[in-house]
Structure formats: structure tokens, C-alpha cells
Amino acid sequence: LVNGAGVTTSPATTLTFSAGDNLVQGEVVYVSGTYVLPASAASGVDPALWNPIGITAEAAVAAADVDVILDDIAIVSSGNIVHQTALTPGQYYYLANIPGKLTASTAPSGITTSGLYGAMTPVGLALSASELHVEIGSPVTLT
């Protein structure tokens, strides 16, 4: 960003938070107070869970510091993805109805109200089988 005086600033792409629970690397998280917790797009949960801020850069135990990738490349594993063993390059991924997980819109269950989803929240674009460019979008409430 460049202001009127020609001074350039770059927003942070990673921030450090306190883990509100035990977290694994590549987990999709939202902020609650001063803690980050696993986000979920499930129906019947507090809509705050539908608003992820990023993906954890490393594993952390509850109350420990954890870096969260807000807008950069995150490494995710098969344990972070629903119905897939790896990311599909070029595929967009969304917040799953399972806390902290990602799903492709083409997953077998899809993202529908019949799949117990309350919202569809874009999280990022797969660059490789394990790299996701984090691009958090606004949740779309499903009715």
C-alpha cells in the first residue's frame, strides 16, 4: 500500500495468536477473544465459526502461541482435507462442516444444506498437492 506521501507499507501475511485448543498444522481457524479455534461451516453452530481468518502454520497445544497464515501460501496435509488425500491444483477450497477442515466444492457430499452446511466460506486456491494460497472470502449463508 502507498499513502499520499509515497510511503509504502505491507500488511502482515502471518500473525501470532494464542491457541484456544490443541491445533494441528494446516487447520482452518477463527478468532474468539484472544484465541484462535477450529472454524466450521456446519449448520446449527454459532455463525462466528463460519468466519475463518486463516490457516495455522504449525501445530500448537492449547494456550501456546501459534502463527496463523492470513494471506500467503499454507501447507496442508490429507488430515486437513475432507474426502481427499491431497489438494487438487487449480481447485478452490472451502471451509468444511468438520471443524478446522477444508473441502472442495466437488467433494462427494458437496456444499449444500443437505450436507449439514450452514455457510459456504471460500478459504483458498490449491497451487499444488500440499500448498494452498490462502484467500479468505466472506461466508455465504445457506438456507
Question: PLM features: residue spans?
Answer:
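Glycine-anchored, exposed beta-strand/edge motif detector
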Residues: 3-143
